[in-house]
């Protein structure tokens, strides 16, 4: 009987561990943000982000658009180079979702998965072109509530640990902060790069410490 109970407990523990959700850990020089996903409402966006993160696609990219009261935006591979002016113009989906040329990954985009989740502080949402089905790898995290974004961009996650990191990032120096009249394409791009790495791990592991 004791052996049976032990086996049952082991089985329950195994099932519990196997069902544990994955989260993303976005690490910067200011600390880590732990993000939970919403696969039930934005499955393609979660899948694409997860694929790219596991590939190391985001590692070394930056938050190239930092706007207090709005968002911090990143995920563009162009931000890995030394040209500040091309940041925000690159990216691709993690796999072929039916948009773009299947044999050309650089053209892959994600169809819109607009939902009822609100854009509040810590919301993880996907940037896109003017095309509703024009999301790639670029994402943003809200640093304030932005109801004007609700239903216009796909929310696919939420920061559950590390909100203070957002507060530190939005206080970095940018061309706009130094010169309100500046209108270059890098107007909100920090002078000192805010680089990131993104790892996918189990919730319990990410929440340690």
Predicted region positions:
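Sec-dependent N-terminal signal peptides
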Residues: 4-14
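Cyclophilin-like peptidyl-prolyl cis-trans isomerases
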Residues: 15-209
């Amino acid at each position: 009987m004791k052996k049976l109970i032990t086996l049952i407990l082991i089985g329950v523990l195994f099932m519990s561990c196997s069902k544990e959700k994955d989260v993303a850990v976005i690490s910067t020089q200011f600390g880590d943000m732990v993000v939970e996903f919403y696969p039930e409402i934005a499955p393609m966006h979660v899948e694409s982000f997860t694929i790219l993160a596991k590939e190391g696609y985001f590692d070394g990219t930056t938050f190239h658009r930092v706007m207090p009261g709005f968002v911090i935006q990143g995920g563009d591979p162009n931000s890995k180079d030394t040209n500040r002016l091309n940041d925000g113009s690159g990216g691709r989906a993690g796999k072929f979702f039916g948009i773009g040329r299947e044999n050309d990954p650089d053209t892959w985009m994600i169809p819109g998965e607009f939902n009822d989740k609100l854009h509040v502080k810590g919301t993880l949402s996907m940037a896109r072109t003017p095309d509703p089905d024009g999301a790639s790898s670029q994402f943003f995290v809200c640093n304030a509530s932005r109801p004007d974004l609700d239903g216009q961009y796909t929310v696919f996650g939420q920061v559950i640990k590390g909100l203070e990191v957002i507060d530190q990032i939005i206080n970095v120096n940018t061309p706009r902060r130094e010169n309100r009249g500046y209108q270059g394409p890098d107007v909100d791009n920090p002078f000192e790069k805010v680089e990131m790495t993104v790892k996918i791990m189990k919730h319990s592991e990410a929440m340690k410490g």
